[in-house]
């Protein structure tokens, strides 16, 4: 059972370790999200996000009574550069939008529905905050994530070519009407 909650400030090192392990564990596999250490996501972004209370973690028991981070994501109102040029379906002011960043699950927990549980938690957070839309993006090559988002009710709002210039990648833009 996955327990989703906000990461605490004293968990910043565990959050950083989670993303390092997730990237390393997926590299070269069919689940590779093509993220780069300290580029996407950067440790500065993750530290600032934990400090701001924007990181949500999905916790599981490790079998010995302790918990570990199996999934994580950042939720804030900050769309990346280029979000303003997308033809979103929901007309919403920036403060009416929740943006999902760097959703990931450790490979050891794939196939258990944890990413879906994280997305459901994200929608709950948006509703509770009175948001009108949840928005996110994913690399065009990340077909598994696209399938997940669409199965969760997110609408495909098109492709932004060269969206991640620093990584040389384009992105598919998604939106959920809250």
Pin down the residues of each PLM region:
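Conserved N-terminal entry element of GNAT/NAT acetyltransferase domains
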Residues: 1-13
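Conserved GNAT-fold acetyl-CoA-binding loop/helix
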Residues: 16, 23-45
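A short helix-loop-beta-strand connector motif used in the catalytic cores of GNAT acetyltransferases and
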Residues: 43-57, 77-82, 99
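Conserved beta-hairpin
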Residues: 52-73
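Conserved acyl-donor/pantetheine-binding loop and adjacent beta-alpha core of acyl/acetyltransferases
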Residues: 66-67, 74-102, 110, 164-167
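C-terminal "cap" of GNAT-fold acetyltransferases
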Residues: 92, 139-146, 150-152, 161-178
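Conserved acetyl-CoA-binding loop-helix of GNAT-fold acetyltransferases
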Residues: 105, 111-124, 147-151
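Conserved GNAT acetyl-CoA-binding A-motif
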Residues: 126-137
